[in-house]
Amino acid sequence: MNSIPSIISKHKAYFAAGHTRPLESRLNILRKLKQAVRTHEADLIAALYQDLHKSEQEAYSTEIGIVLEEISFVMKRLRKWSKPKRVKTPLTHLGSKSIIIPEPYGTVLVIAPWNYPLQLALSPLIGAIAAGNTVVLKPSEYTPAVSAILSKLISSVFPTDYVAMAEGGPDVSTALLQQPFDYIFFTGSVAVGKIVMEAAAKQLIPVTLELGGKSPCIVHKDADIQLAAKRIVFGKFTNAGQTCIAPDYLFVHEDIKTKLTEEMKRAIREFYGPQPERNPQYGKIVSERHYQRLLSFLNDGIPLTGGQSDPNHHKIAPTILEQVRDDSPVMQEEIFGPILPLFTYRNIGEVIEKVQSRPKPLALYLFTTNKEIERAVLGNLSFGGGCVNDTLMHVATPYLPFGGVGESGIGSYHGFDSFNTFTHKKSVVKQTNRFDFAFRYPSSKNGLRMIRKILK
């Protein structure tokens, strides 16, 4: 930790020397990063399995492939994004030009979580590098195998004064948060997000906080039940439910509860087999502490399906809980695991009222073909992002900003929004010397009269 101030000092010097700003240099380094991800693909897949038991398909589709696509998307558009932008000038500034110049903040701290240890480390890094910043990357200590490969990958692409890895536990994060970064990007829990924001506020460092919360899923009676079941099971139990935008609890119209739950059971068997907790391709819980926490939630309801566990591999079968009380522990915090509390409803107003009573979630999912129901939910509920008739997929399009609202986060990224997040928009007025307006000066006799005519 004694080296952390030295790392920051070297990064600031590297940035001040202008090494990160030339467009062609940024494109070239992103190209190298993409190639390095491809080169290390097999090692990354093995590491993701070692740390989280992610299957090869899951590892590629939710981690490696997302990163490769993000780099490709950014590289195709970076030249356009980096250009100074002319904007309109009001009559009061006649003869002048107004320009917005995108410029990097400087040295950025990225604190990444353990649940998607590759994607959630490299996706913000891509945006920061594209914008012209240097980056200090703090990976999670809970995924050491991925961190080891990530360290090799980063060092093969970037000089250490450009991108550096700072590995370790909470003590390293605490030390980093005391440094004079120019921007902080954090992905993690609400509780730690508050600590990050408090530390940043002491130095007036701007932040993006990608947090979480209890994301509801609503299935109305007119939904395509079979399709809804498969998409909910996919969204909830991918990565063993350890996804910040996974459905956290489920509202089902009372008329279709039996049909939907039977289809969900069928989908669980289809995806993960008759004993998911024994399936080597089904994800594991990241730590003993988190595993025990999730096991305790099983006491908060009656398993409609699931509930089995494997303590040797920290696995819990996909579980649907019913007869859950609103004030039970499983409904008081983000679950972050393969447990899905189920509630029934009679009219959509009940659901809207219950969701409104909670902090604004990171995601919301609605299954319906009824436009009025869709308008009622989307128009009355605030959430970071979501899907109608699907789950998770809004996070996979680079054309949409991804981020939270309220307690679920501050700021957004992905695609252009990643570049935008790590860019200061410098506003410049270039004034003409060909003429001057005398009325603007305090010595003008008719200045106030002219100003009143113009500014009204």
Swiss-Prot record:
Keywords of this protein's UniProt record, alphabetized?
NAD, Oxidoreductase
Question: Short name of one Pfam family for this protein?
Answer: Aldedh
- Residues making up the signal peptide according to the UniProt record: none
E.C. number(s) listed in UniProt: 1.2.1.3
- Output the Gene Ontology terms for molecular function: aldehyde dehydrogenase (NAD+) activity
Does Cell membrane show up as a keyword for this record?
A: no
- A single BP term in Gene Ontology: aldehyde metabolic process
Entry's Gene Ontology cellular component terms = cytoplasm
- Coiled coil regions, renumbered to chain: none
What superkingdom heads the lineage? Bacteria
Q: By its UniProt entry, which InterPro entries does this protein fall under? A: Ald_DH/histidinol_DH, Ald_DH_C, Ald_DH_CS_CYS, Ald_DH_CS_GLU, Ald_DH_N, Aldehyde_DH_dom, Aldehyde_DH_NAD(P)
Protein name per Swiss-Prot or TrEMBL: Putative aldehyde dehydrogenase YwdH
Q: Which organism is it from?
A: Bacillus subtilis (strain 168)
Gene encoding the protein:
ywdH
